[in-house]
Amino acid sequence: DYQNRLLNSNDVYKIIKEKNITTLMVTHDVSEACAFADIIIVLTDRPTHVKSIHKIIYDKKEDPINNRLKPIYNIYCNKILGELNVI
């Protein structure tokens, strides 16, 4: 369920940060990417190429659950959803 997904995401994030592991995560979930990532690369449809690159900057980087509570989180999500012609 969604609640467990959020908690698992937080656990993975903490492990990555504690062990200082560079990670490439592929997702179709814009909200997850905006909460989790330092950089988001948006791809086009086939043939795939890079459409845009976004550096995600929070005043204080926290875990994904707390990042979702920040006002800038919605700005990042809306910008990327707009690029994808969702909103």
Regions found by a protein language model. Name each.
Residues 1-2, 75-87:
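Extended, non-globular alpha-helical segments
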Residues 5-19:
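Helical segment within the ABC ATPase nucleotide-binding domain
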Residues 45-76:
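Conserved beta-strand-loop-alpha-helix hinge in the C-terminal portion
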